[in-house]
A protein has these predicted regions:
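Auxiliary N-terminal substrate/complex-recognition segments of SAM-dependent methyltransferases
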Residues: 7, 214, 337-341
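Conserved N-terminal Rossmann-fold NAD(P)-binding element of oxidoreductases
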Residues: 10
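Local cysteine-cluster metal-coordination motifs and their immediate loop/turn environment
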Residues: 13-26
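Short amphipathic alpha-helical interaction segments
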Residues: 330-344
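A short, conserved structural fragment
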Residues: 344-354
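Minor-groove-contacting beta-hairpin "wing" of winged helix-turn-helix DNA-binding domains
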Residues: 355-359
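Short, amphipathic alpha-helical interaction segments positioned at domain boundaries
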Residues: 361-376
């Protein structure tokens, strides 16, 4: 009998504004069938007969684009049949612009115990430049309200290497983030995705981005500054105070299975990676017909081993060679020994006892290093 996943990702695709860099599955909330969407999403969730979860993550889009009453329906529907004694972490993503007191009260009265705020930058001019509608003052107001409501597990997302951004602006952002006195931060360099405003501008030569060496300096500065402030750099883009690592995201990097619920959501169950219908109307119809999925991919053993390496090497702790061999019944040294020795020689990887992991230099070249673990 297959072991059931103990994590679930729930996708709320609605936004009150569309950011210029975002390619996630999302729609402008106005005139959307939000109540019907929530009803269908909860129907899909119920179809898996989920009773025990260790982590539950509600992302988007923007979950807090929902009204307070809609949030209440969602949270109640998701947790009604769950054994809350084993639910370690329930995260919800929020935008500083739309998290008001009523919504915070709903979160407080639910099983939510972790809030992730999409700050992106503290610079009002830059916020406008990247298509965000909130202001710096909204960030402080929301953090204060969340702390007052008793939330101590708060995370923020920041983006660096933004158009026209200087090293001084990055330093200012990091200093303001540290001053918030919160236990977790995710910092991502800007990645240009197709079908975004920024990619269109880039193609027209109208997007002045920092040079690659400046981006590398920004990354090095961020790591050093946050480590000095007591944060552990536990994954390429993530930093936490001790004990406040994102358990849900660690699940992804441990290559564990999880349910993906909602329009455009991806999941990994019984060795099958799947993706749900993206457009809202298509998703609603698919749920009514009893199957929200549009694609399914049965991973081969080779693909599973490759993913174990790609994902695991994102973590500071890297990959356990013993666990790898127990999981796949293959010799780690036979598959990857030569590659690891070569990367160690280049200063991109190190071997600590049972574990292989990337060096700081390796982390910056993460994708290039990961490509070496594709099996021929």
């Amino acid at each position: 009998m297959q072991k059931k996943p103990t994590s679930a990702y729930v996708h709320i695709p609605f936004c009150t504004q569309i950011c210029y860099y975002c390619d996630f599955s999302k729609v402008f909330i106005k005139n959307q069938p939000v109540n019907s969407y929530l009803e269908h999403l909860l129907e899909e969730f119920a179809s898996y007969d989920i009773q025990k979860l260790r982590t539950l993550y509600i992302g988007g889009g923007t979950p807090t684009a929902l009204s307070a009453s809609q949030l209440e329906v969602l949270l109640d529907g998701l947790t009604r049949n769950l054994d809350l004694s084993v639910l370690e972490e329930l995260t919800i993503e929020a935008n500083p612009g739309d998290l008001d007191e009523d919504k915070i009260a709903v979160l407080k009265n639910s099983a939510v115990n972790r809030v992730s705020l999409g700050v992106q930058t503290f610079d009002d001019k830059m916020l406008k430049k990247i298509g965000r509608s909130h202001l710096e003052k909204d960030i402080y107001e929301n953090i204060d309200r969340l702390k007052l409501a008793g939330f101590d597990n708060i995370s923020i997302d920041l983006i660096y290497a933004l158009p026209g951004q200087t090293m001084e602006q990055v330093k200012d952002n990091v200093a303001k983030a540290i001053a918030l006195d919160i236990p977790h931060m995710s910092l991502y360099s800007l990645i240009l995705e197709n079908h975004t405003v920024f990619m269109n501008r880039m193609r027209r030569g109208k997007l002045p981005l920092p040079k690659e060496e400046v981006e590398a300096e920004m990354f090095e500065y961020i790591i050093a500054a946050l480590e000095r402030a007591g944060f552990e750099h536990y994954e390429i883009s993530n930093f936490s105070k001790p004990g406040f690592e994102s358990r849900h995201n660690l699940m992804y990097w441990d290559n564990a299975e999880y349910y993906g619920i909602g329009a455009g959501a991806s999941g990994y169950v019984n060795g099958v990676r799947y993706k749900n219908h993206g457009p809202i109307r298509h998703y609603l119809k698919a749920v009514e017909e009893g199957n929200a999925r549009i694609t399914e991919e049965h991973l081969t053993l080779r693909e599973q081993m490759e993913e174990e390496m790609f994902l695991g090497l994102r973590k500071k702790s890297g990959v356990s060679m013993t666990r790898f061999e127990e999981k796949f019944e293959r010799s780690f040294d036979g598959l990857y020994g030569e590659i690891v020795r070569d990367l160690v020689q280049q200063g991109l990887m190190q071997v600590d006892g049972d574990r292989v992991r990337m060096t700081k230099r390796g982390l910056f070249l993460g994708d290039t290093v990961a490509e070496r673990f594709i099996l021929e």
